Amino acid sequence: IDAFDMKNQILDKRIGTIITQVYNPLIASEVKLRLLEYYNDETEIYYVRAAGIVSEESIRKIPIYELDMQEDIDYLTSIYIPKDMNNKKDFNDLVEIIDTLRGENGCPWDMEQTHESIKNQLLEEAYEVIDSINNDDIDGMIEELGDVLLHVVFHASLGKEDGYFNIYDILESICNKMIYRHPHVFGEGEVNNS
């Protein structure tokens, strides 16, 4: 991954990742902040300088939080993040968990569910989100929004199994809708009020 393109990348912690063009402390700081969205600040990464140049090559392990504090950052600097299966869970993990639960050796209850059988639970979870908002309960919001997201991913898994749609169809649909509804941000339109 090019450090200049970090903001446009979705990192997958389940694979090793090389980030290039980490050539000054400002870029290193931006990369660090992006990595902290996916990894703990103590996660060890490899700081690589002058890879392949025998007399100058340097590779050392550092915690992510120290990335922009390295004194030898220059145009020959890259970093390598090893795969990390024990870190914070992310969206890909949720999709994989649901696929496992509905898979051949999964949970009998999850395997027998249909769009119809779980539709009322989705509505209940949405009401629980509203209750959490009304009670200014941040932890409750995190939990209940997670439950709503679980239902979205579960319905996407059902759609994939039926051959009608998958999670990426849902994501594409909502992204296109948000871009369409905001031409003043993503296009040529102007807006005079909110």
Per-segment meaning from a language model:
Residues 61-141, 191-194:
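Extended low-complexity intrinsically disordered regions
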Residues 5-88:
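A contiguous loop/helix-start segment that scaffolds small-molecule binding in enzyme catalytic cores
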Residues 122-130, 134, 138-164, 168-176:
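An amphipathic alpha-helical micro-motif enriched in hydrophobic residues
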Residues 1-3:
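Long, charge-dense
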Residues 155-158, 172-194:
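Acidic catalytic motifs of isoprenoid enzymes
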Residues 22-29, 165-168, 172, 191-192:
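Short, amphipathic alpha-helical segments
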